[in-house]
Swiss-Prot record:
This is Ribulose bisphosphate carboxylase large chain. The modification N6,N6,N6-trimethyllysine is found at residue 5. Binds 1 Mg(2+) ion per subunit. It comes from Caltha palustris (Yellow marsh marigold). Gene3D superfamilies: Ribulose bisphosphate carboxylase, large subunit, C-terminal domain, RuBisCO large subunit, N-terminal domain. The basic functional RuBisCO is composed of a large chain homodimer in a 'head-to-tail' conformation. In form I RuBisCO this homodimer is arranged in a barrel-like tetramer with the small subunits forming a tetrameric 'cap' on each end of the 'barrel'.
Length: 466
């Protein structure tokens, strides 16, 4: 009899479909699955597909009212992870209709929702996502993108330079503005609010916005270059966030900033739409990312968070520095840097890219290298990140023995020297130290910076292997 058979049944009967060929419109996910002892990988992979799409733990009579074949996620391929015991990469295909158009929030609620607490799994990590063109086209994406940003700022042929204002908490608005002015006047393109600067008792947001705007207009007038300061619009409510962005627009500044993970994808997407409609660039900080992406066997890899940001919208995003890290990390970081900047990225497992991704007409995002970098790293950073990047030196500017402005001068001189050397055909990987030393001869500021940070190891020799 054709009937409804109650009871608990294996997920793999319905959700493990090795014969399935993914469609162009499917969203594909690569999960690193660590099953509990005794759970076969097919069952674990099928459980992931089920729990992140249409499944529940038992058979329900309402299953008969819909077409599971049309809406279910399918685990279509499983491979063991080399060198790891009891870990598998499970590939899952999700039909297009499972996700609301233009909503990163809804996509994540399904794909990385309840399934991560699932008992049959010891650990679960989302390694990569292939976003189908049909779904990509439902997103606005970055407010402006790389080319429009260069045109707005009138800066071409080199990476952009930034600096996070320190101490990050405790300065008054007036003193904060002074620090901004000194950095911009010395030759930086941007200064940055720290991610934890919102609107605290010692410095309310409106005062900070005013003094920073004054600083950048003064620096612009004196240098003849367009300057920006990332005004952090992150707030406790979406309404307050937009209010801050509106005030920034009224001041006529070029760029605002948002903490996209702590602020949330819904707020971020709203802000990105506002920024495109009102000609503001949007700088994105990734505070909280390590909570999600640090563990190798559980969580979400940063390349997925980076893809999600490109869909939600942002013109800059922090993406690590690569310098002084291991070679493998270098390849993987460059993998998601390409995912941020390029229109079309080929599958390349050696760089951690599990799927070919076509972004069609979504603008690119500038990767921001920030954290523990200084003038000796400049050749490495120029070589690794190329022109389409923002290099941010916080302590590497403000820690200069003579102050902020000379610190900014040192960084700008180092950058211009590296770009010129590269354009003349010199090998930055081999001659990096030499190029910086030569530039020191005609820049006292750079010489002083090099002296301060010379003890900090410059680990770039290994780059020849790339």
């Amino acid at each position: 009899s054709v009937g409804f058979k109650a009871g608990v049944k294996d997920y793999k009967l319905n959700y493990y479909t090795p014969e399935y060929t993914p469609k162009d419109t499917d969203t594909l996910a690569a999960f690193r699955v660590t099953p509990q002892p005794g759970v076969p990988p097919e069952e674990a992979g099928a459980a992931v597909a089920a729990e992140s799409s249409t499944g529940t733990w038992t058979t329900v009579w309402t299953d008969g009212l819909t077409s599971l074949d049309r809406y279910k996620g399918r685990c279509y391929h499983i491979e063991p992870v080399a060198g790891e015991e009891n870990q598998y990469i499970c590939y899952v295909a999700y039909p297009l209709d499972l996700f609301e158009e233009g909503s990163v929030t809804n996509m994540f609620t399904s794909i990385v929702g309840n399934v991560f607490g699932f008992k049959a799994l010891r650990a679960l990590r989302l390694e990569d996502l292939r976003i189908p063109v049909a779904y990509v086209k439902t997103f606005q994406g970055p407010p402006h993108g790389i080319q429009v940003e260069r045109d707005k700022l009138n800066k071409y042929g080199r990476p952009l330079l930034g600096c996070t204002i320190k101490p990050k908490l405790g300065l008054s608005a007036k003193n904060y503005g002074r620090a901004v002015y000194e950095c911009l006047r010395g030759g930086l393109d941007f200064t940055k609010d720290d991610e934890n600067v919102n609107s605290q008792p010692f410095m309310r947001w409106r005062d900070r916005f005013l003094f920073c705007a004054e600083a950048l207009y003064k620096a612009q007038a004196e240098t003849g270059e367009i300057k920006g300061h990332y005004l952090n619009a992150t707030a406790g409510t979406c309404e307050e966030m937009i209010k801050r962005a509106v005030f920034a627009r009224e001041l006529g500044v070029p760029i605002v900033m948002h903490d996209y993970l702590t602020g949330g994808f819904t707020a971020n997407t709203s802000l990105a739409h506002y920024c495109r409609d009102n000609g503001l660039l949007l700088h994105i900080h990734r505070a909280m990312h390590a909570v999600i992406d640090r563990q190798k066997n559980h969580g979400i890899h940063f390349r997925v968070l980076a893809k999600a940001l490109r869909m939600s919208g942002g013109d800059h995003i922090h993406s690590g520095t690569v310098v002084g890290k291991l070679e493998g990390e270098r390849e993987i970081t460059l993998g998601f840097v390409d995912l941020l900047r390029d229109d079309f990225i080929e599958k390349d497992r050696s760089r951690g890219i599990y799927f070919t991704q076509d972004w069609v007409s979504l603008p690119g995002v500038l990767p921001v290298a920030s954290g523990g970098i200084h003038v000796w790293h400049m050749p490495a950073l120029t070589e690794i990140f190329g022109d389409d990047s923002v290099l941010q030196f916080g302590g590497g500017t403000l820690g200069h023995p003579w102050g902020n402005r000379p610190g900014a001068v040192a960084n700008r001189v180092a950058l211009e020297a590296c770009v010129q050397a590269r354009n003349e055909g010199r090998d930055l990987a081999r001659e990096g130290n030499e190029i910086i030393r030569e530039a020191c001869k005609w820049s006292l500021e750079l010489a002083a910076a090099c002296e301060v940070w010379k003890e900090i190891k410059f680990e770039f020799e290994a780059m020849d292997t790339l």
